[in-house]
């Protein structure tokens, strides 16, 4: 069985099959998390809307895949309450937050005590092509249609075809580094 196909708890055990003939033994999860905290990453709120409802979450695991055609990916823990909503809706929007939007980041990360349904009460929200919520003050928004989802360890890697882009105000972006928000 490929490591891509294993259940999250199998991957969390620290050893799984690799493409190479020898098994892969990973570093301790706490060491890995500490090491990853040293990588600065832009902070995004990923939103979705459609027949399964609307939802969103804060993410730093977002990156470009290709510009031909424009494609990006987002990683989402499968245990997140947003995971089934996003999968059923088949669309999402990556809203890259401005440095001043830490309250929105915390709200969608579940750190504010606000119910998931009330997250959209903060900020001004619009829509582009897919109907997903677009934060008007975001530095940039990528409106995407899901083209593939791969299960890897505890997360889904969601690939999206970028159907629309909205460039926001040219402000500093919010970054997460060493377990704290910073601006770039």
Briefly describe each language-model feature range.
Residues 2-184:
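Basic, polyanion-binding surface patches
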């Amino acid at each position: 069985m490929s490591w891509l196909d294993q259940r999250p708890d199998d991957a969390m055990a620290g050893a799984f099959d690799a493409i190479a003939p020898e098994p892969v033994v990973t570093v301790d999860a706490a060491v890995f998390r500490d090491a990853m905290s040293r990588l600065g990453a832009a902070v995004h709120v990923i939103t979705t809307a459609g027949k399964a409802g609307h939802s969103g979450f804060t993410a730093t695991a977002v990156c470009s895949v290709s510009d031909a055609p424009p494609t990006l990916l987002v990683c989402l823990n499968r245990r997140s309450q947003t995971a089934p909503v996003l999968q059923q809706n088949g669309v999402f929007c990556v809203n890259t937050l401005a440095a001043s939007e830490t309250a929105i980041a915390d709200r969608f990360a579940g750190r504010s005590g606000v119910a998931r349904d009330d997250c959209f009460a903060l900020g001004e929200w619009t829509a582009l092509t897919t109907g997903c919520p677009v934060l008007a003050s975001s530095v940039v928004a990528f409106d995407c249609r899901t083209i593939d989802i791969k299960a890897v360890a505890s997360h889904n890697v969601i690939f999206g075809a970028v159907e629309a882009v909205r460039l926001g105000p040219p402000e500093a972006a919010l970054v997460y580094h060493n377990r704290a928000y910073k601006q770039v």
